[in-house]
Structures are given as C-alpha cells and as structure tokens.
Amino acid sequence: MSIRVQKTFEALFELEEIRGIFRDSLPTGLSAEEEAAFRQRIGNLKAIVADLEAGTGTPKVTKIAGTLDVRSREEQYINIHPIQAAGRLTTEARKAIISYGDGYSTCDACRKPFRLDKISKPGIAEFHADLAKWLNMDHARVVPGARRGFQAVTGTLVNKGDSVIVSALAHYTEFLSVENAGGVIKEVPLNAKNIVTGEATAQKIEEVKTETGKLPVLVMIDHFDYQFANEHEIREIGKVAHQYDIPFLYNGAYTVGVQPVDGKKIGADFVVGSGHKSMASVAPSGVLATTKEWAPKALRTTAIVGDLTKRKFGIKEVELLGCTLMGGTLLSMIASFPAVKERVLHWDEQVKRSNYFIDRLLKISGSRVLSEYPRRHTLTKVDTTGSFDTVAKTHKRRGFYFSDELSSRGIVGEFAGATRTWKLNTYGLSEKQVHYLADAFTEIAEKFELPVTK
C-alpha cells in the first residue's frame, strides 16, 4: 500500500480513537484521565499527519479488529470490477457513514406515526418524496437491495402457481422472488443479438395463456441485463404488458443512479433500483417506486390483530416488514443523492469512455466483445480467448499472469485468472483513467507479442 494511503487510513483510525474518548466521557466534559488520553491521541495524530504530508513512515495499522485487512483498492487502484463501479461511495456518503454508522441512527427523532418514510429529522421523508419525483413515479420506498424490491412486488401479486414473465437473462434474485411467492418462471427467449424484444414478450404471454388458460400476473424485465449489459426493448415490453393488462416491473438495477430513468415514460408500474450497485450507497440498499394505482396493494399497511393482546401496529407496511433501512445504509444513499442526480445527466460521457476502451481492446488481435457493440453501457462482457488466453496456455501462472500484469499497473477488479470470457465496468473513471486503462492493456499485449493494430 502507498505510504500516503496507509497514513490516511491511520489518521482516520486515530480520529476514531479520539472520538471514542468523547463517547465514553460524561456530558460535562473529559476527566483528567480522559484528557491525558486525548492529548496522547492528538500527539499520535500529529505524527501520522506529518508522515502523510512527507510521504514517509512505516505502516502501524494493518488490520481492523485484528482480522480485517484495510481495504484500499479504491484509493490505490483503478477498479474495473463489474458490480462495484457505480456503488463506490461519494465523499459525502463516506462522511455520512462516519456520522450515522450506529445501528438505529435514523431513529433519533422518530415520532408518530413511527414509520421510516415519515421521519423529518434527518430529512428521510423529504428524500422519499424527492426519490419518487426523480423517477417520475408516485411513491418510493427504500429497501435492502433490489432483490427486496422484487420480493415486495411478487409478494403482492403472485400466488401459488401463477406465471411470471422474465428475461432469459434474468438475475437469480428475480427467480428467487418468484419462487418465494409460489410462482412459476416463464422466460422470454432472446433474439440473435441477445436482446429481449417486445414482440418476443407478446409471444411468450400468448404461449403462457394457451398453456395455462390464464395470463401471467407480472412482467419483470431488466433494462440492461447483468450478463451482457445489453439494452432490451423496455418501452416496447412495457406497452405489451399494458396491452394485456399485466403489471410491469422495470428492473433498473443497472440504470437507476447512473442514467436517467423516467418510470411513467417507460410505462412501469414498478421501478426497482439498487443502491449499492448503482447509487453510490452502502449495501444492502435499494429503491422500490410505484404508481398511485399499485401503491395501495404493494405498500398496503398491516391489519393483523393479536388474539390475546389485541395489539395492532399502525401503518407499518406489510411487504416491507415495516421500516427497512434504519442506519448508515439509508444515510449514505441520502448523502450521495445530490451527486447521483447530477451524474445521471452525464451518462453519455460515461458510455463514450466505455466505447473508447472497448475500441482500444479490439485493436488487440483476437479480442472480441460479446455484448452489443457499440456499447450502450459501461458494463461489458469481453472474450479474450484469442488474445490474452493464448499467453495463458503456456505461461507458468496460467491465467493469473494477466491479473499479475494488471495489478502491477495499478488495475484490479477483473475476475482473477480469467483470460477467456469475463466482464468489466469502466463507470466513474475519468478520461485520463480510461486512457491509462487502455494503454495498460496495449502494453501487456505488446509485452507478450500479441498483434496490436495501431
């Protein structure tokens, strides 16, 4: 680890030790013993900051709680991990975690009606309203990941034996959410370009109707899938669903938070997004948004009454099991939200950089793109069987040589040892970082005498 990065972490950790002194003290101030400990820690901090400024010193803290490594990949490397890119916390989110990391930190000023989305301090109620408006939906809730959004919708709409339409590239959590509700998965086949079309969706609905004698109860399709990150005919699919009067769930796990999403324009009855995948938030976090039509069902409140105590639980929402994100997860999402709203306006720039890198990769003979091309997303599946894998076949490190070469150039996030088909994501990289990334791949190719087109 770079000594300056190391010392930055040590300074942060030392400040937390100082913070602990205040937490253990009385409201009236520090005792003499605590004051001495405080001054000792301040001295330590000054020494760390001096090392940080000079770029000198040796590592003093290498583990957290004795077992956890200090995670510094975002500070030290260009990270192209396929699912980590858009979940990197903003500076404001990291500050929020420092301040709101305690368990029920959202609940300091919780008052009647005792529900998360009604809390005004901090501004959680306002955030929920802003979130719905931003997605052009009528209501929004935060959930522990997109998967819990799927689960809330399937729990509302799906009964045992009901059919649910999904993509042939659907994520496993979509499958599990249907299974959990007792439903049956019906997959829409892909066309030759690995795209789900509106026409194919209509055909699948007709097949289900013929086979079962009734229509599917839900159409749940990804805008961009997780395997290829291909863009599917989401608006056409929404229109088809409505023609059959079937509710449509728009899976925006790879869009909400990185590109503009207009739920009503898309024709979505439900919009589901991932906070930790695409909204610069701590995991597990996500969003579920819906319309006025479906809110009374999907966001229905409890009606159950205890037989002995006659207890009732007010306006807690059944499918969400009441309050959802009660601490740092939600506050990180709120803190990142201004930056997230701004960055979606620059999606085209991110896609342009993705295409720059892919264009450079394709100049290395034998490299292919398995995703649609030109790219419409920053997540891409590539095939380097004809390029970097030819080296792996005879290299003593096999495919791990490629990881070694990337790591030595400050690049991480590829699937270690993979030199055939693998995925990467350039989201959030600056222009100079994308150029550096492309140059690094070219350098590795040239080092091992792979043909490169200039």
Curated annotation (Swiss-Prot):
Presence of the UniProt keyword Protein biosynthesis in the record: yes
Modified residues (N6-(pyridoxal phosphate)lysine): 277
Cofactor(s) needed by this chain: pyridoxal 5'-phosphate
Gene Ontology biological process terms, A to Z: translation
Keyword Protein biosynthesis carried by entry: yes
Family matches, as InterPro entries: PyrdxlP-dep_Trfase, PyrdxlP-dep_Trfase_major, PyrdxlP-dep_Trfase_small, Sep_Cys-tRNA_synth_arc, SepSecS/SepCysS
Spans traversing the lipid bilayer: none
Record's catalysed reaction(s): O-phospho-L-seryl-tRNA(Cys) + hydrogen sulfide + H(+) = L-cysteinyl-tRNA(Cys) + phosphate
Record note on quaternary structure: Homodimer. Interacts with SepRS.
Family to which the UniProt record says this protein belongs: Belongs to the SepCysS family.
Name recorded for this polypeptide: O-phospho-L-seryl-tRNA:Cys-tRNA synthase 2
